[in-house]
């Protein structure tokens, strides 16, 4: 998993509340267990017209936001079913940070396991960031995970809070497998001592 230390990029505004995982990645795209290629299905029902052509009114289809790395979204983002394809689709599109006032718990935790930083902010701060994100190609935010700080296009900044363990995992690019490998030497030491103490079980 790629490390997340500092991210600077275009932030796309999505001022919609209760965006569920079916909206993020419709069920038609759940037939694969590959993490790549799902970016085309991200918000598919909103991004595409019935004939499959791009819906030019949807924010991620607008030229200024086609390479967005950050999503500023309404309250309760990622609610609904627990499909891990939702963060996979966001990541495959190129989005590595989602900012909202709240997230569904399962989606929130799945983000960290896939290298995405979900940031919780107050409604006041979200309104400010949503306004910043509405500046089109000038909607540049910098997310500094080391200092827990968001800097806007005007140079103003705001702080956010994050569980220290989750912060450690993102800063070091550690998913569940990576965390286990961090303890590889301790695991190996235990296995050897346990085998010596219980040779009949070896």
From Swiss-Prot:
Keyword entries, A-Z: Amino-acid biosynthesis, Branched-chain amino acid biosynthesis, Leucine biosynthesis, Lyase
Molecular function via GO: 3-isopropylmalate dehydratase activity
Q: Which InterPro entries match?
A: 3-IsopropMal_deHydase_ssu, Aconitase/3IPM_dehydase_swvl, AconitaseA/IPMdHydase_ssu_swvl, IPMI_Swivel, LeuD
As its record notes, the protein acts as a catalyst of: (2R,3S)-3-isopropylmalate = (2S)-2-isopropylmalate
Q: Where are the transmembrane segments?
A: none
Database matches in Pfam families: Aconitase_C
GO CC annotation: 3-isopropylmalate dehydratase complex
Which pathway?
Amino-acid biosynthesis; L-leucine biosynthesis; L-leucine from 3-methyl-2-oxobutanoate: step 2/4
UniProt keyword annotation of Amino-acid biosynthesis present: yes
Its BP terms in the Gene Ontology are: L-leucine biosynthetic process
Question: In its keyword annotation, does this UniProt entry include Amino-acid biosynthesis?
Answer: yes
Q: Give its E.C. classification number.
A: 4.2.1.33
Protein family (similarity comment): Belongs to the LeuD family. LeuD type 1 subfamily.
How it assembles, according to the record, is: Heterodimer of LeuC and LeuD.
Function noted in UniProt? Catalyzes the isomerization between 2-isopropylmalate and 3-isopropylmalate, via the formation of 2-isopropylmaleate.
What is this protein called in UniProt?
3-isopropylmalate dehydratase small subunit
């Amino acid at each position: 998993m790629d490390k997340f230390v500092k991210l600077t990029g275009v932030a796309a505004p999505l001022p919609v509340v209760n965006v569920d995982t079916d909206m993020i990645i419709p069920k038609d795209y759940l037939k694969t267990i590959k993490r790549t290629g799902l970016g085309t299905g991200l918000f598919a029902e909103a991004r595409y017209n019935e004939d499959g052509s791009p819906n030019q009114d949807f924010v991620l289809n607008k030229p200024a936001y086609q390479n967005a790395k950050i999503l500023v979204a309404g309250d309760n983002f990622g609610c609904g079913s627990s499909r891990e394809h939702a963060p996979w689709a966001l990541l495959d599109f190129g989005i590595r940070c989602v900012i909202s006032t709240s997230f569904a718990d399962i989606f929130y935790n799945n983000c960290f396991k896939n290298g995405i930083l979900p940031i919780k902010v107050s409604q006041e701060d979200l309104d400010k960031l949503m306004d910043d994100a509405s500046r089109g190609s000038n909607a540049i935010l910098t997310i500094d995970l080391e200092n827990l700080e968001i800097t806007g296009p005007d140079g103003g900044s705001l702080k956010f809070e994050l569980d220290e363990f989750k912060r450690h995992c993102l800063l070091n690019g550690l998913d569940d497998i990576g965390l286990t490998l961090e303890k590889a030497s301790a695991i190996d030491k235990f296995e050897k001592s346990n085998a010596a103490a219980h040779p009949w079980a070896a």
